[in-house]
Amino acid sequence: MTILSEIVKYKQSLLQNGYYQDKLNTLKSVKIQNKKSFINAIEKEPKLAIIAEIKSKSPTVNDLPERDLSQQISDYDQYGANAVSILTDEKYFSGSFERLQALTTKTTLPVLCKDFIIDPLQIDVAKQAGASMILLIVNILSDKQLKDLYNYAISQNLEVLVEVHDRHELERAYKVNAKLIGVNNRDLKRFVTNVEHTNTILENKKTNHYYISESGIHDASDVRKILHSGIDGLLIGEALMRCDNLSEFLPQLKMQKVKS
């Protein structure tokens, strides 16, 4: 069993045990009308748009420094991030919907609920906690699930980042006409990353979609390796959480887009 299938099994058990219904019943609703649109930001931004992540740990990383997360969000905002990603999985990533709820009020930037969504109820909880964007991972969804969840999220006025790991999944993302597509550079079987995976997947990409490179981006040299793939933005977590000088580091990553 891969780590991803293990996580999905865990999410299914949470759904069956009423975890998400309890969250919906107990979390105070956070209004997100003041949130900016990430897609609008991409359209207007001549430089790469940055989704800056709040992350405590992952199945492969356990030694991230503890940060004042309110200050981290403020720094992301101040130094040029275009959106914030907040992990809400408790078991594998030490996140929570309560954390999302507390931090989303600290910024007007779009906030992505990064989780493993397989059911509309999870989308309801994400929205109630104050997310303005959600993540859908093509690899863990059937075509019908992907279409239904995508359309449901859009109907709830949420933006959707559809994540792909290979060219076949990219074609599946095109089928639902996903406007915002994330290319994950992590090998799902071995959980290792290669940033140039983005170049391979986007070699024959379609126009009229926006592309975000995710995972394995540690510095400006990594960004330069994938800039000519025609990406519109980056999702970066670990490198930002480790950085003690965001005022210099974050602007370095916001390179001029290269349209291929």
Swiss-Prot record:
A biological-process GO annotation: L-tryptophan biosynthetic process
Taxonomy, superkingdom: Bacteria
Reactions it catalyzes: 1-(2-carboxyphenylamino)-1-deoxy-D-ribulose 5-phosphate + H(+) = (1S,2R)-1-C-(indol-3-yl)glycerol 3-phosphate + CO2 + H2O
Keyword Ubl conjugation among record annotations: no
Coiled coil feature spans: none
Pathway entry: Amino-acid biosynthesis; L-tryptophan biosynthesis; L-tryptophan from chorismate: step 4/5
CDD domains, per the entry: IGPS
GO molecular function terms noted in the UniProt entry: indole-3-glycerol-phosphate synthase activity; phosphoribosylanthranilate isomerase activity
Keyword line: Amino-acid biosynthesis, Aromatic amino acid biosynthesis, Decarboxylase, Lyase, Tryptophan biosynthesis
Enzyme nomenclature, EC number: 4.1.1.48
Family: Belongs to the TrpC family.
Protein name per Swiss-Prot or TrEMBL: Indole-3-glycerol phosphate synthase
Gene responsible for this protein: trpC
